[in-house]
Amino acid sequence: MEKEDLDLLGGHIAEFIDNPDEIVSYRRVPTQHADIVAYQRMRSAFNHMTVMFKKDMVLKAGNYEDGLYMEDDLLWLNMIAAGAKTGNLDQILCKVRVGAGMFERRGGLRYLKLYRQARQRMLERGQISYMEYAKSVAIQAIVALCPGFVRQFIFVKLLRKRK
C-alpha cells in the first residue's frame, strides 16, 4: 500500500439504481487529512464500503460502539480524536446500488432520534461544536421528515456530483 502512514483510508463511489453501467451520481469525499477532519464534523468523510483501516488504531479509538445507523461516523471521529492519520484516494473504488430502500432508511422519527443521539455524543466529547450540532440536526430533521421521493432527490441531485 502506497499510503502506509495512514490509519484510515477510503475513496469515492459511483452510484446506480438498477443497472451498474448507468451511473446516476458520484459521492466524492475529501482526500487530504485536514480536509477530512473538517468535513467529518458535518458529514461522513468516508464511503464505508471503500474503507480499510489499521486494527490497532480502531482498538485504540475504542472500536465500534453502539450507535445504530451512525456507528461508522462515530468510529471515524473517535479514530481522528485518537490521532489517526486519514486519507481518501482520488479514485472511484466501487459502484454502489442506491435504491428506494436506502432513502427510506434515512427517514422518519426513529432515524432522526438516533441521528440526534449520535450527534449529541459527538458534542459531549468535544468532537463537534454546538453550532455544528445544531446545524446538522436541523438539516437532518428536514431531510428525515420529508417524503422518501424528496429525500431521494436531495441525495441524488443536491448532495452528489453528476460527473
Question: Which residues make up each language-model segment?
Answer:
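Conserved nucleotide-sugar donor-binding
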Residues: 47-61
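Catalytic core of nucleotide-sugar-dependent glycosyltransferases
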Residues: 84, 96, 104-129
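Terminal low-complexity segments of carbohydrate-biosynthetic enzymes
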Residues: 140-163
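Acidic donor-binding loop at a coil-to-helix junction in glycosyltransferase catalytic cores
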Residues: 69-77
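Conserved donor NDP-sugar-binding/catalytic core segment of glycosyltransferases
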Residues: 1-25
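Short, well-ordered alpha-helical scaffold segment located
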Residues: 15, 56-60, 92-95, 102
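Catalytic beta-strand/loop signature of glycosyltransferases that borders the donor
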Residues: 11-12, 86-93
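Short, flexible, basic/aromatic active-site loop/helix in glycosyltransferases
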Residues: 12, 26-44, 59
